[in-house]
Structure formats: C-alpha cells, structure tokens
Curated annotation (Swiss-Prot):
Disulfide bond annotation, renumbered to this chain: none
Name the UniProt record assigns to this protein: 5'-nucleotidase SurE
Leading EC class: hydrolase
Locations listed in the record: Cytoplasm
Binding sites annotated in the UniProt record for a divalent metal cation: D8, D9, S39, N91
Protein family: Belongs to the SurE nucleotidase family.
One GO location term (cellular component): cytoplasm
Top-level taxon of the source organism: Bacteria
Cofactor(s) the record lists: a divalent metal cation
Protein purpose: Nucleotidase that shows phosphatase activity on nucleoside 5'-monophosphates.
Length: 249
C-alpha cells in the first residue's frame, strides 16, 4: 500500500512528521505538503500560477500551494505509482463542528476522496505537540484497519483526538458535527506607519455541543470520528423551495 500524507500546517510541522513515522513501517508513505502554514484555506486550488514541488532534506515534498493542491498534484501526475489512499494531519488544533468548512486538513482528505481514494483527516485538540505520540498511535490503528470499513462512496472520516496521553483516552465515539457560535469580532490594529489592518479572531465556542456531537466526545476524553459526505445538498429544503419557486414563476 502507498499512502499520500498531506496537511495544512506545513511540510515542517511536527504533526505531519509524527504521522509519517507512525505509518512508515506499515506502508510506503509519501509526504506532499505546503511549504508554509496554510491553515484555514479550505479546499482552494491555485489557478493563477504554476506550482513548484521541492524535495526537502527529510525526504518530504514541499509545494508552494494549498493542501488541496498537494493532494490533487500528488494523485494526478506528481507521484508514480499513484498512492492508494490519503491521510491528512496531524493538525495541531481542533477541526470540530463548522471548522470542517474552513479546514485545509479536512479539505486535503476531501480532495483525496474526489480522486476516489479512501481518506482520513486527523486533528489533535492542542496547539502544542506534547500528545502527538498518542494521536499518531490512534491514526495508525485506524489506517491499519481501514479495509474493514464499509463506507458509502464519497465519504471522508474526520477524526479529532483529545489532548491527552494515550492511557487517559477513554475510547472512540462515532459523532455528528456540532456547531459553533458566531466567531469573535475581527481585531483592528494600526501598524507603526499608521496603516489600519484587521486580524481574523478566534472561532466561536460550541453552541451545539451536547451528547452525540464531536465537541462533547472530545471534551469527555473520547476520540471523535465523524463521517463527512461530499454531497452538500440539503434535501429536506426541496419541498419548501418548490412551492416558493412556483409562486415566483
């Protein structure tokens, strides 16, 4: 088996190194990751210029593009033979609830699924790497047994791991996405030359984070696994929209 590993924290981030090391003895692993931190870019593709892969001293391939660029290129011309699956992460920071809409980590996995490869996205609930060994162990366990999964087509698994050592993790829970409250207001700043600018502020707290959600599971010390579907059609809205359109036309 050949695994394409990507992320959004960048090719030199500790999370992707930990993930690579955890999987390297069970499969041939090839890392293609952004040359710099590309957190929050979602599934954007670079269309206004060529992309330039660069081989790093650790054997990883760094790309001057987005996480989705990395997977798209890795599965469509850069790598031969083409990898059999895509594993994204390990992200330093949660990708819970609405985070999945912005996450480059999740988007990399989604691009893998677009290209008809099984795909995981792994995130650790910490900006610090202390518990990466536990997260890497869990990632390895899930990837190692992925062939036993009977997932519908066009499904991606988003996995969030609590910031705990392995012995304190209570188990794994299958969860739905929760929802966050509105993000905090952007922070206005003025640079030394008097030019105004804004920092995008932190994400909102969990607004829908009760039992059954990914928020609740990780706060209780469980790994959360959420199956994400690529079809974002809201089928339940069809009836109301049909009658609305009839009135308009």
């Amino acid at each position: 088996m050949r695994i394409l590993i990507a992320n959004d924290d960048g090719a030199l981030a500790p999370g992707i190194a930990a993930l690579h090391d955890a999987l390297a003895d069970m499969a041939e692993c090839v890392v293609v990751a952004p040359i710099k931190d590309m957190s929050g870019v979602s599934g954007s593709l670079t269309l206004d210029r060529p992309l330039h892969p660069q081989l790093l001293s650790n054997g990883f391939i760094a790309l001057d593009g987005t996480p989705t660029d990395c997977v798209h290129l890795g599965l469509n011309g850069l790598l031969d033979p083409v990898p059999d699956m895509v594993v994204s992460g390990i992200n330093l920071g949660a990708n819970l609830g609405d985070d999945v809409l912005y996450s480059g980590t999740v988007a990399a996995a989604i691009e893998g699924r677009f290209c008809k490869r099984p795909a995981f996205a792994f995130s650790l609930l910490s900006r610090e790497p202390d518990n990466l060994p536990a997260a890497a162990h869990i990632a390895r366990t899930l990837v190692e047994h992925h062939e036993r999964l009977a997932l519908p087509p066009r499904t991606v698994l988003s996995v969030n791991i609590p910031n705990l050592p392995l012995e304190r993790i209570r188990g794994i829970r299958l969860c739905r996405l929760g929802h966050r409250a509105r993000a905090k207001a952007p922070v206005k700043m003025v640079n030394p030359r008097g030019k105004e600018g804004y920092w995008i502020s932190v994400a909102g707290d969990a607004e829908d984070g009760g039992p059954g959600t990914d928020f609740h599971a990780v706060m209780q010390g469980y790994v959360s696994i959420t199956p994400l579907q690529l079809d974002r059609t809201f089928h339940e809205a069809f009836a109301g929209l049909d009658s609305w359109l009839e009135d308009l036309l």
